[in-house]
């Protein structure tokens, strides 16, 4: 992955308008410093890391805002004012770009 990032960063015209989203397809299990949601139809299970590499990101910043894989699609739709790109992004919850405060699914522990 670092090869791709280096290639883009070495092209100033491309880099100045780029955001690279790096995420994994699954979490690392139940060893987690944060809340681990129960896995159910509505529960999210373990957290999945995402790294954004861009000239627009703050150096050394860590953001704990709730997001999921669909959040990337929703970001693209909102940023470029596009219609929903897939059936999975038709809803507006959770939509980290429009929610204030922390989001926990309905199956969160009480």
Give residue spans per PLM region.
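N-terminal pro-sequences and low-complexity stem/linker regions of secreted or lumenal proteins
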Residues: 1-110
């Amino acid at each position: 992955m670092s090869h791709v990032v280096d290639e883009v960063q070495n092209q100033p015209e491309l880099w100045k308008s780029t955001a690279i989203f790096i995420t994994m397809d699954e979490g690392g299990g139940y060893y987690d410093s944060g809340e681990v949601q129960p896995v159910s139809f509505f529960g999210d299970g373990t957290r999945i890391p995402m790294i954004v590499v861009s000239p627009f990101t703050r150096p050394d910043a860590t953001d704990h805002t709730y997001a999921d894989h669909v959040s990337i699609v929703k970001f693209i739709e909102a940023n470029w004012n596009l219609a929903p790109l897939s059936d999975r992004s038709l809803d507006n919850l959770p939509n980290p770009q429009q929610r204030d405060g922390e989001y926990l699914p309905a199956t969160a522990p009480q």
